[in-house]
Swiss-Prot record:
GO molecular function: DNA-binding transcription factor activity, RNA polymerase II-specific; RNA polymerase II cis-regulatory region sequence-specific DNA binding; sequence-specific double-stranded DNA binding
Keywords attached to this entry: Developmental protein, DNA-binding, Homeobox, Nucleus, Transcription, Transcription regulation
The name this protein goes by in its record: Homeobox protein Hox-A6
Protein's job: Sequence-specific transcription factor which is part of a developmental regulatory system that provides cells with specific positional identities on the anterior-posterior axis.
Annotated DNA-binding residue span(s): 155-214
Annotated SUPFAM superfamilies: Homeodomain-like
Gene Ontology terms describing biological process: anterior/posterior pattern specification; embryonic skeletal system development; regulation of transcription by RNA polymerase II
Gene3D superfamilies recorded: Homeodomain-like
GO cellular component terms, semicolon-separated: chromatin; nuclear speck; nucleoplasm; nucleus
Keyword Nucleus in annotation: yes
Record motif Antp-type hexapeptide, residues: 136-141
Comp. bias intervals (Polar residues): 107-119
Pfam families: Homeodomain
Length: 233
């Protein structure tokens, strides 16, 4: 207990018999009305409801109970323990309130559920729905740098399609040159609005197709010796 407070129940008598002198000494300055402390065994329910003009009062749990320069009524119902402040709630959620929730409110208003909590929850849900339903623009998708083919769901590149004019020009070039130099490949790519890589892949596939066709033709045609043997018979 602080030494600035004096227990009024303690008999202030001196062994020398100067009782009258002790009663004449003022305990506090003029105009100062201090809180009367009580022993630890004194119950909280018997605290008198009295109006004090204290400038500010703070609870031990770092949460402000009242902060007003005007007169404020401190009664037994305004004092709460740390357990009550952290656990007591009408909704049973156990949410710890901030310091501003206890300013200038009665005990009934302090634990009244906030009417704006439902609105805040609705705004949060709306924001979450907006996040998941946001439109996907074409520039947000993964695209093929050559012809604009969108990648599939498994990240596979789409099959490149050529127009009829592009196919005709490539076939004409393949008829004269089955292998292209890089310079010629760049010229054809610029003329047909394609990339050098697409031209290279198309010629590789076309050469494989041409080899298969030649192999099939050679296998179906009989050799010269077989034809002569059949003719001699």
């Amino acid at each position: 207990m602080s030494s600035y407070f004096v227990n009024p129940t303690f008999p202030g008598s001196l062994p020398s018999g100067q009782d009258s002198f002790l009663g004449q000494l003022p305990l506090y300055q003029a105009g100062y009305d201090a809180l009367r402390p009580f022993p630890a065994s004194y119950g909280a329910s018997s605290l008198p409801d009295k109006t004090y003009t204290s400038p500010c009062f703070y609870q031990q749990s770092n949460s402000v109970l009242a902060c007003n320069r005007a007169s404020y009524e401190y009664g037994a119902s305004c004092f709460y323990s740390d357990k009550d402040l952290s656990g007591a709630s009408p909704s049973g959620s156990g949410k710890q309130r901030g310091p501003g929730d206890y300013l200038h409110f009665s005990p009934e208003q302090q634990y009244k559920p906030d009417s704006s909590s439902g609105q805040g929850k609705a705004l949060h849900d709306e924001g979450a729905d907006r996040k998941y339903t946001s439109p996907v623009y074409p520039w947000m998708q993964r695209m093929n740098s050559c012809a604009g083919a969108v990648y599939g769901s498994h990240g596979r590149r789409g099959r490149q399609t050529y127009t009829r004019y592009q196919t005709l020009e490539l076939e004409k070039e393949f008829h004269f040159n089955r292998y292209l130099t890089r310079r010629r490949r760049i010229e054809i790519a610029n003329a047909l609005c394609l990339t050098e890589r697409q031209i290279k892949i198309w010629f590789q596939n076309r050469r494989m197709k041409w080899k298969k066709e030649n192999k099939l033709i050679n296998s179906t045609q009989p050799s010269g010796e077989d034809s002569e043997a059949k003719a001699g018979e």
